[in-house]
């Protein structure tokens, strides 16, 4: 049989073997010594370096199929980034950290790291028919053991204790409440049809953004696969299914009401979302009708944003009187002034005497913590993983002075061209307008980029996030709407293009990388206008063990009023790039507004004159 090299060079072509020695050796037979020290000739085509099928022009070379080597199992949590919600990639556990429990004695015992301790808990032991499918689903999702926060929070919840958890980003908080909630529910609502226990919203998860709600729903589906658990995200399309499962007084009496809603931080154009059955709905379909759920089939787990859920409660369309488990994920954000007017009525509506609450976040300011304890029985059990309100230690953090807005763009382009910004990456900016500006600029640079912010429709945001997860998009330009809870395990670098307004904002932003024990990198740009707040962020870097120049730590501390002012509104900045046609962008906006106002005045004047002329005609 002719060699592969002969086949490729047939036809009289001459080839300089010395000049292209390295390339030539790819097709040469190699020699290696066996265990006895004798030389042994190896045909490269029979080994792993077989001739690619694209080069096998004559089709006479075998293409052996090599079985992949089995990957060693490791203690890991599932990577819930794929559409199916599971992954076969082993994920390293986060670095071990001290876990502190405080609260009323006796304090609950933490679970063991092995999974059977979850389903065989003395307070809520499951049968093999109940626990077997859960363990199988966890195995399929590549979850082989529990992590520290999951052991601590799981132990608290399974002993029926209200819990307040503060744990770093990427430490596994979502599973820490999803798994024990499923164990305590025991059976899906479908198996409890016709009983009181199988009615209503059985467990409720409240989150600040729609994007996080969709992600949590993916986690729930992954670990409940095989037992027909009923879980859903509350959207315009699923409203009807929700209030049919847990009807309020307005639904029972047939009253009508307004269904228009927008979700605070999750604002944007509402789109028709698919419900459980794949159907879509419009606003007109949500007026109370004859129930399409006559058996009163309950919802095992409902994931909702505050504004839409509060609207259903306020209009008496839904009842949460049967809800036994309430979880506030990113609770410090939900207990802030933006969401508190909606969250308090939601908590009050969960009037079941046996209701159990769990509040979790990566950051918990003193004000939010004291407010949370008022809603927890006996103040709850406080679980702190590592150092409270600190950044994740697996992220290499740095601060970069850019001088101006044009300097920011230049620095970003330099990072990209020098290979210091590997894909996939997240770029945080402070507003919707700036996100769109930077997105359009990077598109013109030929980068596969997309933008996600509150001004985009939900379906467009979901599509952009999906493309980012599968690698169709290399970079995402995002606002704070994606800073909390979103799990992008593959993100290697986070760029704070605009300086974060608060320490919690910084911690949550950089927490999108370095998740589940993986290394990550965060670079924060700053200019002159960010100087007064630089020391605050520099202290976070120092507490995480990252090097910080001394001059930053010696800078004047910002006053409380300055911090409050920055938290309420970001500093005004020039347009992205800081020059060219964008330099007078604000002036152009004002001029346009003045022209439009002038046109309106003239139009009103004309209408007024026309009306007077008609009156004069009538008088005549």
UniProtKB/Swiss-Prot annotation:
Residues 31-115, 244-293, 556-620 are annotated as: Disordered. Its EC number is 3.6.4.13. A motif (DEAD box) lies at residues 329-332. It is found in: Nucleus, Nucleolus. Residues 562-575 have a biased composition (Basic residues). It comes from the Eukaryota. GO terms for molecular function: ATP binding; ATP hydrolysis activity; RNA binding; RNA helicase activity. Keywords: ATP-binding, Helicase, Hydrolase, Nucleotide-binding, Nucleus, Ribosome biogenesis, RNA-binding, rRNA processing. One of its GO terms (biological process) is maturation of SSU-rRNA. Residues 71-82, 266-277 have a biased composition (Acidic residues). The keyword Transmembrane helix does not apply. GO terms for cellular component: nucleolus. InterPro entries: DEAD/DEAH_box_helicase_dom (IPR011545), DEAD_box_RNA_helicase (IPR050079), Helicase_ATP-bd (IPR014001), Helicase_C-like (IPR001650), P-loop_NTPase (IPR027417). Gene3D superfamilies: P-loop containing nucleotide triphosphate hydrolases. It catalyses: ATP + H2O = ADP + phosphate + H(+). Its main location: nucleus. The keyword ATP-binding applies. Belongs to the DEAD box helicase family. DDX52/ROK1 subfamily. The Q motif is unique to and characteristic of the DEAD box family of RNA helicases and controls ATP binding and hydrolysis. ATP-dependent RNA helicase involved in 40S ribosomal subunit biogenesis. Required for the processing and cleavage of 35S pre-rRNA at sites A0, A1, and A2, leading to mature 18S rRNA. Interacts with the U3 snoRNA and is associated with the 90S and 40S pre-ribosomes. This is ATP-dependent RNA helicase ROK1. It comes from Cryptococcus neoformans var. neoformans serotype D (strain JEC21 / ATCC MYA-565) (Filobasidiella neoformans). The lineage of its organism: Eukaryota, Fungi, Dikarya, Basidiomycota, Agaricomycotina.
């Amino acid at each position: 049989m002719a060699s592969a090299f002969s086949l490729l060079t047939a036809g009289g072509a001459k080839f300089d073997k010395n000049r292209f020695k390295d390339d030539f050796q790819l097709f040469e037979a190699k020699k290696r010594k066996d265990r006895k020290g004798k030389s042994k000739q190896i045909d490269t085509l029979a080994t792993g370096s077989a001739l690619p099928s694209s080069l096998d022009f004559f089709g006479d070379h075998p293409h052996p199929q090599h079985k992949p080597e089995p990957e060693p199992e490791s203690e890991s949590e599932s990577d819930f980034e794929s559409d199916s919600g599971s992954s076969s990639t082993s994920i390293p556990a986060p670095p071990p950290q001290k876990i502190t429990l405080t609260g009323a004695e006796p304090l609950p015992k933490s679970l063991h790291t092995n999974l059977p301790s979850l389903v065989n808990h003395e307070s809520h032991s499951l049968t093999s028919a109940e626990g077997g499918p859960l363990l199988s689903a966890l195995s399929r999702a590549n979850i082989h053991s529990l992590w520290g926060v999951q052991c601590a929070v799981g132990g608290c919840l399974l002993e029926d204790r209200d819990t307040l958890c503060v744990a770093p980003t990427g430490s596994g908080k979502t599973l820490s409440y999803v798994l024990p909630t499923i164990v305590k529910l025991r059976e899906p609502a479908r198996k409890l049809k016709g009983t009181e226990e199988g009615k209503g919203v059985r467990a409720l998860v409240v989150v600040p953004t729609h994007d996080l709600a969709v992600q949590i729903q993916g986690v729930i589906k992954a670990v409940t696969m095989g037992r027909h658990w009923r879980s859903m995200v509350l959207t315009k399309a699923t409203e009807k299914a929700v209030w049919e499962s847990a009807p309020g007084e307005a639904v029972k009496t047939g009253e009508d009401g307004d269904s228009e809603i927008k979700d605070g931080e999750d604002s944007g154009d509402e789109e028709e979302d698919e419900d459980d059955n794949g159907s879509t709905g419009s606003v007109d379909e949500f007026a109370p009708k004859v129930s399409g759920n006559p058996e009163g089939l309950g919802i095992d787990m409902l994931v909702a944003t505050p504004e839409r859920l509060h609207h259903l409660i306020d209009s008496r369309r839904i009842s949460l009187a049967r809800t036994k488990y309430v979880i506030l994920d990113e609770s410090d954000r939900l207990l802030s002034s933006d969401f508190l007017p909606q969250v308090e009525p939601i908590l009050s509506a969960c009037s079941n005497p046996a209701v159990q609450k769990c509040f979790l976040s990566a950051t918990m300011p003193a004000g939010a913590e004291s407010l949370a304890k008022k809603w927890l029985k006996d103040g709850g059990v406080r679980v702190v993983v590592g150092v409270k309100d600190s950044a994740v230690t697996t992220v290499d953090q740095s601060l970069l002075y850019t001088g101006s807005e044009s300097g920011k763009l230049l620095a970003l382009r330099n990072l990209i061209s020098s290979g210091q910004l590997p894909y996939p990456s997240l770029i945080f900016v402070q507003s919707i307008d700036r996100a769109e500006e930077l997105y359009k600029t990077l598109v013109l640079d030929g980068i596969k980029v997309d933008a996600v912010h509150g001004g985009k429709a939900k379906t467009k945001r979901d599509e952009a996030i999906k493309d980012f997860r599968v690698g169709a998009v290399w970079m995402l330009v995002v606002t704070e709407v994606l800073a909390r809870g979103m799990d992008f395990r593959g993100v290697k670098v986070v760029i704070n293009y605009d300086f974060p307004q608060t320490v919690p904002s910084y911690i949550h932003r950089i927490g999108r990388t370095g998740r589940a024990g993986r290394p990550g990198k965060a670079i924060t740009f700053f200019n002159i206008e960010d100087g007064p707040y630089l020391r605050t962020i520099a202290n976070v870097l120092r507490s995480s063990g990252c090097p910080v120049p001394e001059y930053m730590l010696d800078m004047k501390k910002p006053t409380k009023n300055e911090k409050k002012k920055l938290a309420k509104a970001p500093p005004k900045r020039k347009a992205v790039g800081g020059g060219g046609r964008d330099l007078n962008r604000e002036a152009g906006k004002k001029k346009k507004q003045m022209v439009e106002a002038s046109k309106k005045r003239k139009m009103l004047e004309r209408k007024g004159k026309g009306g007077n002329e008609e009156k004069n005609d009538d008088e005549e």
